[in-house]
Amino acid sequence: MDRILKLLTWPAAVFIAGILLWYEQYKLTGNQGSVWLFTVLSDWLGIHGYEKPFRLGVGTAEIVGSILVVLPWTRIPGAALCLGIMSGAIFFHTVSPLGIDPYHDGGQLFQEACEVWLCSAFILFAYRREAVAMVERIFGIHLPRIA
């Protein structure tokens, strides 16, 4: 069963990279919609005028996550990074003035964030033993064994 789950991480990783890299063209080129979205967020957070570093920082993190999740030897940290980024996206869409449908397109951006989050969580589940071992190695702690 674990072998099948690990094989299924390939399409999940490609899906994650495809979605994240598709939106980079908007974040990194200063697309009007992307600038508006990050301006709303930075103003809501009380850090007025920091739209550009916020937008470029998220975009850069998404590119790094996309690369890491596709490479088999870095899939675990890549999935963890993508899960964290998408957790932030989902959080800000649900609690900030953005809402889940900021572009009035039926909430496509929010839906894709949820899909990327689910694929990232699936990858971490498929590699759960390796992920736990990695955390133990990095932090020098012992975690309870999971099935």
Ranges and model annotations:
Residues 1-147:
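Membrane-interface extramembranous regions
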